Design a protein with these regions (language model features):
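Conserved beta-alpha-beta core of the PfkB/ribokinase-like small-molecule kinase fold
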Residues: 76-154, 160-161, 170-171
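Conserved N-terminal subdomain of the carbohydrate kinase-like
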Residues: 1-75, 254-259
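Short glycine/serine/threonine/alanine-rich loop segments
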Residues: 15, 99, 243
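Glycine-rich phosphate/pyrophosphate-binding beta-alpha loops
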Residues: 29, 75-79, 234, 240-243
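Short gly/ser/thr-rich secondary-structure transition/capping motifs
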Residues: 49-58, 111-117, 145, 215
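Acidic, amphipathic alpha-helical patches
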Residues: 61, 122, 190
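Conserved phosphate-binding/catalytic region of the ribokinase-like
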Residues: 92, 144, 148-259
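Short, hinge-like loop/turn segments at secondary-structure boundaries
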Residues: 9-13, 36-39, 118-122, 149-152, ...
């Protein structure tokens, strides 16, 4: 029921769902979000196991993966087999085809067998990645660094060409090979931060597509514009409750940026 609802939601937004795999033997993982007074969240999950952990290598659509412009994945598909192997195989397919690889590692303790295993698995794929978004806390968890600035440097050394460390209401640290800078967030009244990081990264990836050049050849001002657009998307997202319902339209984002 929940999976079909989500599929219909995507279709209503004009998103192609042809490659979604349905597994009648497992239910869709459910996330329950508790919202604090400042809009920050606590998560709990129903996943014993969820259908998302059951994706198999043979179910991958190689034509679709090889033909896309950006292949984005997160770390929660690395928690269990067979999805872990399928995810890594999909990333390798995309990379072999010259597709830009985007990665967003999330640490949700209840979905991992241990913190040590989570860190090991989340780090294992970084070398395959071109652009990466990570929170300040998770950047330190991944690297063991003393600060998120140092963590960004260490992540860049692992392979990514561009790293974005999200800093909540402070904005984001954008880091590339020869430069890093904090791009301040738009000041808004946050009621629910669910989806803020995803919205931010969606804005960044949209900008990268519109610039249409290899990330390593982008000028710093172009990288900065990517972050500003991402911050604008996130700034609107946190003003509404919910995940998908709070994601703004492109028109709303540009209007917000002009104010």
């Amino acid at each position: 029921m929940h999976g079909k609802f989500l599929k219909k939601t995507l279709q209503k937004e004009g998103i192609n769902t042809d490659a979604i795999v349905e597994d009648p033997g497992y239910f869709t993982t459910l996330a329950f979000v508790e919202i604090g007074e400042n809009g920050e969240r606590n998560f709990s999950f129903a996943r014993k196991p969820g259908a998302d952990t059951q994706l198999k290598k043979e179910e991958l659509d190689q034509t679709l993966i090889s033909g896309c412009r950006i292949f984005h994945f997160g770390s929660l598909s690395l928690t269990d087999e067979p999805a872990e192997s399928a995810t890594i195989e999909a990333v390798k397919m995309a990379k072999a085809a010259g597709v830009l690889i985007s990665y967003d590692p999330n640490y949700r303790p209840s979905l991992w067998k241990s913190k040590e295993r989570a860190v090991k698995k989340m780090k294992s794929v970084v070398e395959l990645v071109d652009v990466m978004k990570v929170s300040d806390e998770e950047s330190i968890l991944l690297t063991g660094a003393k600060s998120y600035e140092q963590a960004a440097e260490e992540i860049l050394a692992m392979g990514p060409k561009l790293v974005a460390v999200t800093l909540g209401e402070q904005g984001v640290l954008m880091a590339a090979k020869n430069r890093k800078e904090i791009i301040k967030a738009f000041q808004t009244n946050a009621v629910d931060t669910t989806g803020a990081g995803d919205s931010f990264w969606g804005g960044v990836l949209c900008s990268i597509l519109s610039i249409n050049k290899p990330v390593e050849k982008m000028e710093w001002e172009e990288i900065r514009k990517c972050a500003v657009l991402g911050n604008a998307v996130a700034g609107l997202c946190v003003q509404k409750r919910g995940g998908i319902p709070a994601i703004p339209t492109k028109e709303a984002v540009f209007e917000f940026m002009q104010k």
